[in-house]
Amino acid sequence: MLHPRARTMLLLSLPAVAIGIASSLILIMVMKIASVLQNLLWQRLPGTLGIAQDSPLWIIGVLTLTGIAVGLVIRFSQGHAGPDPACEPLIGAPVPPSALPGLIVALILGLAGGVSLGPEHPIMTVNIALAVAIGARLLPRVNRMEWTILASAGTIGALFGTPVAAALIFSQTLNGSNEVPLWDRLFAPLMAAAAGALTTGLFFHPHFSLPIAHYGQMEMTDILSGAIVAAIAIAAGMVAVWCLPRLHAMMHQMKNPVFVLGIGGLILGILGVIGGPVSLFKGLDEMQQMVANQAFSTSDYFLLAVIKLAALVVAAASGFRGGRIFPAVFVGVALGLMLHEHVPAVPAAITVSCAILGIVLVVTRDGWLSLFMAAVVVPNTTLLPLLCIVMLPAWLLLAGKPMMMVNRQKQQPPHDNV
């Protein structure tokens, strides 16, 4: 016979698995549709018209029209495509289901159009809203927070292709007590995360790891080098943190989201022309291309890091629906490669992983997620002790510093003004 604690954990197992599978399927559906539309916009259509896909006019035109299209969706769809991600954390309160169709359309347009944001925030919003709405009807005795946690865990597992990230993140939020141990609370979320990760793995495997030279034995000088790299990445990230609310306030002085996002798309197009096609989109596939291109120099990596960080700030400030983690990882990779090219004595594995750790820590202010992203992009167990040590001064640098979010009390998203 099972202990009552075990029966309690099993109670939510079936809903957790169902939510994990559904979270993954929603992500896969959105990414597949966005991929088809992206291929149409950036491959087939310019080929049919006899235009080079990296033509400055094409890049500027597509991104400007993408901004206008997303602005129209936000302006006229029911629920105005959900909350402005610039004003929200990754895991937020559930939104009304009526806002989800507009949010999904806005996300797909942004992903396909080359906007420098990832899918993580909108997908998280969609999955939480559906889990809470459906769960409240099927099992009304289960509170909304439980559904939110399960949907969040399932989405994280689906996004990263592993339940490890969910385990790390929720281990610091689901604090155990004398009555309910931590792993009792983690049981159902990990079931959801595992189901989400396994479902994603049936269709495609998220490819985060980069072909970077293996790092051998850790030395004391490597710790100092890693801490300096992380500090440089944090400094770059804090510039973006300073710029985001100010640019957001300036752009949203225009009350119509069509104008705001149209101008934002135009700026993104200009940045895309400067940085080239590799600086567009969410950044995961593009960072693979960046590492594979042996022709890039120190100045090229620096330019890509600056352009991508600027594009991230502009896209978020304009109100595009998307997340900031994936493009931040691209920035970290570009910074790390730049620093390695500048000081070849420091291994690329250290510069890239520590730069990712620093920039993701700025964006998420989540130590476990930052460690996870650094370790998964540069998969080397020898680096783990070094990353844990480097995290300490990095965390000290960011203690009490503002987060990469807009204070919603000072600045409302555009759809609240129409």
UniProtKB/Swiss-Prot annotation:
Main location: membrane
Signal peptide as annotated in the record: none
Entry keyword Iron-sulfur: no
Localization annotation: Cell membrane
Keyword set, alphabetical order: Cell membrane, Ion channel, Ion transport, Membrane, Transmembrane, Transmembrane helix, Transport
Cellular component, GO, one term: plasma membrane
Any GO MF annotation of the entry: chloride transmembrane transporter activity
Topology within the bilayer: Multi-pass membrane protein
TM helices/strands, residue ranges: 10-30, 54-74, 99-119, 120-140, 149-169, 186-206, 223-243, 258-278, 300-320, 322-342, 343-363, 371-391
UniProt keyword Transmembrane present: yes
Family: Belongs to the chloride channel (TC 2.A.49) family.
HAMAP family, A to Z: CLC_YfeO
Name of the molecule in the record: Putative ion-transport protein YfeO
Organism of origin: Escherichia coli O1:K1 / APEC
Taxonomic lineage from the root: Bacteria, Pseudomonadati, Pseudomonadota, Gammaproteobacteria, Enterobacterales
Name of the gene this protein is made from: yfeO
